[in-house]
């Protein structure tokens, strides 16, 4: 983040922007903007990204377009102490990339076992919701990875964060955006 001036960073942070690397240069973009601009992922594979996009969209409609995969990928690519992920709050042991790889692998493995080799992104909406319901209840017999209910909770929280954790998200809900602790003066 040395390439980004502090003032520009703080202004970007106020609108939910994160530092993404585009063409070798760090720029401030929201996850939605990063998704729209097809910013290359740094850590997740295309298969993991497809699973995360599909899972996020099934959990919270609009999560894919809001950039859930770009958000998670950016967050697991930075030092753990800087991450804004719920995984950090829930004391998941860093590196967070290991947790997300295992979680997304477990989703894929359980989906393929239950649905004849089809990964989660290839399921129809009803199958995805059935799978998520079983996942939420820890009832997927073929699940191999971090606890299914815990993975459900964290992926749902990530999806909610990118869709509704912004000023635009608050506006969608018809809720006035108010900072929890507003600064007393400009920094």
Each predicted region: which residue ranges?
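Generic structural signal for individual residues within well-ordered alpha-helical segments
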Residues: 7-10, 129
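Long, amphipathic alpha-helical surface segments
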Residues: 140-187
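Flexible, low-complexity segments enriched for small/polar residues
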Residues: 39-40, 49-52, 56-152
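Generic secondary-structure boundary/loop-capping signal
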Residues: 1, 41, 57, 117, ...
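Sec-dependent signal peptide hydrophobic core
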Residues: 13-17
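Coiled-coil-like amphipathic alpha-helices with heptad-repeat character
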Residues: 1-2, 151
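Residue-level marker of structural boundaries
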Residues: 18-19, 137
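C-terminal segment of N-terminal export signals and the immediately downstream linker at the start
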Residues: 3-8, 21-58
């Amino acid at each position: 983040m040395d390439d980004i001036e502090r003032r520009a960073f703080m202004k970007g942070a106020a609108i939910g922007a994160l530092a993404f690397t585009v063409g070798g240069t760090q720029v401030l973009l929201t996850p939605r903007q990063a998704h729209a601009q097809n910013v290359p992922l740094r850590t997740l594979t295309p298969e993991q990204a497809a699973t995360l996009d599909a899972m996020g969209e099934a959990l919270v409609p609009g999560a894919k377009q809001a950039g859930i995969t770009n958000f998670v990928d950016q967050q697991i690519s930075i030092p753990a102490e800087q991450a804004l992920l719920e995984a950090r709050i829930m004391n998941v042991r860093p590196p967070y990339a290991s947790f997300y790889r295992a979680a997304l692998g477990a989703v894929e493995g359980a989906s393929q076992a239950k649905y004849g080799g089809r990964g989660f992104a290839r399921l129809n909406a009803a199958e995805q919701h059935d799978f998520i319901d079983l996942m939420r209840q820890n009832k997927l017999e073929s699940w191999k990875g971090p606890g299914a209910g815990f993975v459900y909770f964290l992926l749902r929280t990530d999806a909610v964060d990118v869709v509704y954790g912004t000023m635009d998200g608050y506006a969608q809900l018809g809720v006035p955006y108010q900072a929890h602790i507003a600064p007393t003066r400009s920094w």
